[in-house]
Amino acid sequence: MKIFNTLSRRKEEFVPIEEGKVRMYVCGPTVYNLIHIGNARPMIFFDTVRRYFEYRGYKVNYVSNFTDVDDKIINKAIEEGVDAAVISQRYIDECKKDMAAMNVLPATKNPLATQEIGGMEDMIGELIGSGHAYVAKDGTVYFRVKSFKDYGKLSHKNIDELQSGFREIKVTGEDGKEDSNDFVLWKPKKDGEPFWDSPWSKGRPGWHIECSVMSKKYLGDQIDIHGGGEDLIFPHHENEIAQSESASGKSFANYWMHNAFLNIDNKKMSKSAGNFFTVRDISEKYDLQVLRFFMLSAHYRSPLNFSADLMEAAKNSLERILTGVDNIKSVIQRDNKAPISDAELSNLEIAKVLKDKFVAAMDDDFNTADAISAIFELIKLSNTSLNENSTTEYANGLLKVIEPLCDVLGIITERKTEILDSEIEDLIEQRTQARKNKDFALADKIRNDLLEKGIVLEDTREGVKWKRS
């Protein structure tokens, strides 16, 4: 299995630290609002990486944090007049709902930054003691970048050419920096902000130290894979390396993986441009299985363009797979116990070759696009070979190949019964048109079909209202 390592900028053979086990850390969201579709890409991709390792027999310890203390969380809490913890817990809960709808498996651990403050203070203290960090007069603690000779090795930046562009919250006393590239490990509190006592000041940790500490606590000083979006390479992941390796004296992560950006209609997603979509927005029109399938339709290191046309294409492609699986299951239900034929045995050998093609694609830096192509070939083989005389043994053989591969990609092959809001509205419109055309039989059928799916219609003077029973 080969993985493209951002650190070396080349594909490398995966060799785990501990045989048969994988330690993975993936940076999670800052929970101040509903997650957007840009957040969804790393969630879906690294969940797929985790699933594939498990498919290959590895035991995966998968840790992904929630950043639950941040300026954006604090500002929202002030706007609403509530504690910051109320905001963060609200959106952690909503994030978990969206992740479940995208069939993202629960992480082994989802640590919260605010629950790991003690560990952060310990690591900061160690860094100060070893000369890698220093305390400014106002109680801000900075990491001394020049003390870490390998700084810049992940982003391939020359430290002498770096400009101070770190994502850190400006604080009074920043003049206390020894060097413009030094970054914050601990910042003194401002009025109205949550804070914790520390040996240096009442305040809170910097963003970068949070992940170093949570990774160390739950995975150890050295991990196999660290992942995230490519926007995190610098400064966040660069700073994590500096902190973790300065504290432990060991190499932090053996493989660094980063997914590329998601654009909307070939433009950067932004609220001001009016092209900003939350996962919840997408769920109003599509089953989130479609979003997941769309995200995996391109290689993770390739920029991905989101558009209505491409989502429709993903919906249709996913439907081809699900219909193919339905077809196999219908043959199984016919329960033809006749002996499997030579032709069917030959087709099962072809299916095994296609399974190997799927594995080869995933072994090549998790090429999900090519892996999906292998599944389509399996579906084509199934569709063209199954007929009224097909044996149950043959159909079961096909299903045993296809379903585990779908599961690796997080494709749920069992049909969902819940109907989407947009589908309900479409059916109500069809029913309204049928009534105008005096086709009352069709109108009644639509009403009854919706009722069977738990949707109750009410005809009012203002129009048709509906609710889920």
Whereabouts are the PLM-identified features?
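Short Gly/Ser/Thr- and Asp/Glu-enriched loop/turn motifs at secondary-structure junctions
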Residues: 106, 136-138, 459-463
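N-terminal, positively charged nucleic-acid-binding surface of large information/translation enzymes
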Residues: 8-13, 17-105, 462-466
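Short catalytic-loop micro-motif centered on adjacent basic/acidic residues
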Residues: 62-63, 108-111, 226-228
